């Protein structure tokens, strides 16, 4: 495990955001809060093995491996506990987030609208060992996001691009000071993502940068403490 999470130079901007910031519901459809939690060393081995074995087999709008590692590192560095994911797909990014949450004492709330992808994700959560750290919803995020009370200190959005801006508008008041709102496909998402990025970069409550990662890009917007 010692070599898995080296910090490449590409992470420097994200680290800078955290340095700058230091200066300044609806019940889940699926949850296993009572499941026995694996010891950290055992869980690390189980998740790492699962992610490595499945590294080249993810389909259906899952993030690339490199971007999953970025999510993991952001949650660990920020010590985030109240995590929301919009767009589970079959669970690759969720597993990275939940693995990090297992170390920060947190939990991931994730939303998926497609039943087949949702069902596959649940099985992947069990196989990887992170199911106890996930509340998974089979729901339309357009409606559910508005209903969730928060607060959240980390949000990852990887869903319908034409709704990126609305998701942020709905969630911005529910993000804790010092928390981060991240969105995938920041470099390849088309006009809808450009509109979202223009809006969030102009929001004085947040400081935003783009992490290239796999090349698809991830926007990282951290809320400035008042």
Predicted regions located by residue number:
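A short alpha-helical cap/connector motif
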Residues: 4-5, 13-156, 161-226
């Amino acid at each position: 495990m010692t070599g898995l999470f080296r910090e490449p130079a590409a992470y420097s901007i994200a680290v800078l955001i955290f340095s700058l910031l230091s200066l300044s519901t609806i019940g889940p459809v699926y949850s296993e809060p009572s499941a026995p939690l694996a010891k950290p060393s055992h869980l690390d081995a189980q998740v790492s093995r699962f992610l490595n074995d499945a590294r080249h087999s993810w389909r259906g709008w899952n993030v690339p491996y490199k971007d999953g590692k970025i999510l993991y590192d952001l949650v660990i560095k920020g010590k985030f506990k109240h995590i929301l994911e919009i767009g589970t797909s079959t669970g690759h990014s969720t597993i990275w987030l939940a693995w990090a949450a297992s170390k920060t004492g947190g939990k991931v709330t994730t939303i998926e609208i497609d039943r087949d992808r949702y069902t596959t994700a649940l099985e992947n959560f069990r196989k990887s060992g992170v199911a106890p750290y996930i509340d998974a919803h089979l729901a339309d995020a357009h409606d559910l996001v508005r209903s969730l009370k928060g607060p959240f200190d980390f949000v990852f959005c990887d869903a319908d691009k034409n709704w990126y801006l609305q998701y942020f508008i709905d969630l911005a008041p529910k993000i804790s000071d010092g928390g981060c709102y991240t969105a995938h496909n920041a470099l390849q998402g088309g006009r809808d993502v450009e509109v979202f990025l223009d809006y969030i970069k102009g929001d004085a409550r947040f400081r935003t940068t783009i992490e290239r990662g796999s090349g698809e890009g991830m926007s990282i917007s951290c809320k400035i403490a008042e």
